Amino acid sequence: MGTGAFYLLKERRFLPFFLTQFFGAFNDNAFKLAMLTLISYHLTHDQAQSEFYQAIAGALFIMPFFLLSATAGQLADKYDKALMTRLIKILELFLMIVGSFSLYWGNIFMMMLTLTGLGVHSTFFGPIKYAILPDHLPKKDLLGATGLIDGSTFIAILLGTTMGSLSIGMNNPRPYMAVFLTVIIAVAGLTSSLFIPRAPSTSEKIKIDMQIWRVTYKMLKQVTEHFGIFLSILILSWFWLLGTVILTKLPDYTNYVLGANNTVFALFLALFSVGIACGSVTVNFIFQGRISLPMVPWAMFAVSFFTMDLYWATPLMEEGSLLTLNTFFTQFTHWRIAFDLFMLAFSSGLFVVPLYTYLQVASPPQSRARIIATNNVYNALFMVIGTIMVISLLHFSAAIPKIFFILSLLNAVVALLAKINLKRVVLLEK
């Protein structure tokens, strides 16, 4: 274990699934950004129209997590997860073919329909993503494997977002590159899924309850019966709220507060994604496969520290042209801001990976996928709460740096509560 978990990338029990989830995360974001870029630059004629479609796209993608997560969890527990993954990848390939036609024709309705389908695809893959790891790996490998999965997801999001937006030509409304890219990646994902080893059913006798609201309520209630699992889900959901608030306001922070152009924003996005990935992988180097919950609140306190420093480091914007990537880093303060962004993301990676690993270990095998699915519902709910929080603070004329300040204080309170309550979990688990 001295070399971390990278040796797992040489093994069939991990590599095919690793590639499959990477390609899936890449494609979700590549298609979404290609679609939004096409709509913004070629299919709409004013900012309000473009922002309307952006809001609709966000709602359509997240909606299936509320409606179908319970069903997805049941299916993942009942059937072979490797087989389920292949079926999901076939669906993704079909969606990408339909989506490529919608991009080529510039049909917004078909694009939105495809994006909704990708939301369904992600909803059904979500429970499998973490529930399948204990089927293939011993407990000592789970922390490292989870770190690789978590870190690679954010790298895939970054690459997909970048490639998706760049695949739409500014002068050519026919998105040939986007069409080619999304279909090829879908084929790659399906191909890699064919090599995933079997992951037999852990709950064959379960009856699939198609009453969505009833089974969702039942699952949400059941996780509260296990204190450690419920607490982990709440902390993970708080992470997604943090990420939603920061990433939602990062473009405006870069433009209107720092007075920098889109190249600086692209760098910030890269720093954030790479920071989480580095933190996710570093956990296993530190703890050598041991799941350490006591370190979680300390990593959360670090997030608060760097978010607070982001507030203090933010200068008053001077009038003038937007700063480019070259001119932005002529000031030490801007280096400090970039460092803060990287480190708050790095610290986030340090605390989410042990929690995701704990969920895998603490969940009963026969209901593991349903518990992961329930976590996804809570994550989606907290992301919506984060969006509402930003809108509310802006309504009361809170400046973006002040939002970061408030966020750092709230996170410190959550970290303190986590520190107190995780002690109880550690005692209960001994």
Where are these regions (language model features)?
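Hydrophobic alpha-helical transmembrane segments
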Residues: 108-115, 119, 144-203, 275, ...
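Extracellular/periplasmic helix-loop-helix junction of adjacent transmembrane segments
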Residues: 34-65
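Juxtamembrane intracellular "pre-TM" segments in multi-pass secondary transporters
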Residues: 1-15, 199-235, 256-257, 323-329
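Small-residue hotspots at the loop-to-helix junctions and early N-terminal turns
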Residues: 47-55, 262-269, 373
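C-terminal ends and interior cores of transmembrane alpha-helices
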Residues: 86, 90-106, 301-330
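Transmembrane alpha-helix termini and helix-breaking/packing motifs in multi-pass membrane transporters
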Residues: 34-45, 100-105, 158-182, 256-257, ...
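Substrate-agnostic recognition of the 12-TM MFS/MFS-like secondary transporter fold
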Residues: 15-33, 57-95, 110-169, 231, ...
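Helix-loop junctions on the cytosolic side of multi-pass membrane transporters
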Residues: 131, 135, 182-208, 314-317, ...
